Regions:
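An acidic/histidine-cluster motif and surrounding catalytic segment
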Residues: 1-100, 104-218
Length: 218
C-alpha cells in the first residue's frame, strides 16, 4: 500500500492518541491526517450545502420506519475527516491507502503481512476492504462469499480500512453525506464494492480486546 493515514485531531487528546499510534507496530509508517473538529464546525456555511447534511434517517436504517434525527457535532466532524482523506487519495493519485482512526490501537502481530496478503488476493473490483469492523448478525445473510472474502452490504465501525483510488473517487462523488460515516459508506454498497476478509486485524479500543481472527460469523 502507498500510504497509511491516521485521522487525529489537533487537540491535547488527539496528540496523546497520535503518540499512542506511533508506539504501535506500525510506528513510522504512519502519516498523520488532521481531522475536522466537529465542535468548531459551522455546518450552515454555504460550502457544506452539497457536501454534508446534519439530518439523517436513523429510523429507516435501524427499523425500517422513517425517523429523522440529527448527527452530533462529533459525527459531522468524523464524516468530513474521512471525506477529506478520500479527497487526498484522489488528488495525490494514491493507488491504495489505509485509513485509520486514532483509537484503532490494537493490532494483530502479523498485521503488515496479513494486510499485504489481503491486498494481493483481493477481488479485482474492490473499492474498500474493511480491516476492523463489526457485522451485525442481521446483515450476515446479505453477504456474498468471493474466495476468502465476503462482499459486504452493511457494517458498523470505520476505524480501519483500505481504500483504492477508484473507491475514493466513487465516494467523493456521492455526496451529500447524510448519515454517520460507517452507515453512509454502507449505504453506498450497491455501487461501491466493499469487502472483508475472514481476518480482523485491528480492534477499536474498548470494543474488542484481543481478537486476531474471526470465524464466518460475527
Amino acid at each position: 500500500m502507498n500510504k497509511l493515514f491516521v485521522i487525529s485531531l489537533d487537540t491535547d487528546t488527539g496528540a496523546k492518541k497520535w503518540k499512542s499510534m506511533q508506539n504501535t507496530i506500525l510506528g513510522n509508517r504512519l502519516t498523520k491526517f488532521t481531522g475536522v473538529y466537529g465542535k468548531l464546525l459551522n455546518i450552515e456555511h454555504p460550502k457544506y450545502n452539497n457536501l454534508i447534511k446534519r439530518d439523517w434517517d436513523y429510523g429507516s436504517w435501524k427499523y425500517g420506519r422513517r425517523d429523522i434525527v440529527e448527527m452530533s457535532d462529533s459525527e459531522l466532524g468524523c464524516c468530513l475527516s474521512h471525506f477529506n482523506v478520500w479527497n487526498k487519495v484522489v488528488e495525490d493519485d494514491i493507488d491504495v491507502a489505509m485509513i485509520l482512526e486514532d483509537d484503532a490501537i490494537r493490532y494483530n502481530k502479523k498485521f503488515i503481512d496479513i494486510t499485504d496478503d489481503i491486498i494481493k488476493t483481493a477481488p479485482k473490483n474492490w473499492d474498500i476492504i474493511l480491516l476492523g469492523f463489526m457485522i451485525p448478525n442481521r446483515y450476515l445473510k446479505d453477504e456474498i462469499k468471493v474466495g476468502d472474502f465476503y462482499k459486504v452490504k452493511e457494517f458498523v465501525l470505520a476505524h480501519s480500512y483500505l481504500i483504492s483510488n477508484k473507491g475514493a473517487n466513487k465516494l467523493i462523488h456521492k455526496t451529500p453525506i447524510n448519515a454517520p460515516i460507517d452507515t453512509w459508506m454502507s449505504l453506498q454498497s450497491p455501487t461501491v464494492n466493499i469487502y472483508r476478509h475472514n481476518y480482523i486485524v485491528t480492534n477499536k479500543n474498548l470494543i474488542q480486546s484481543n481478537l486476531v481472527a474471526q470465524s464466518d460469523t460475527v
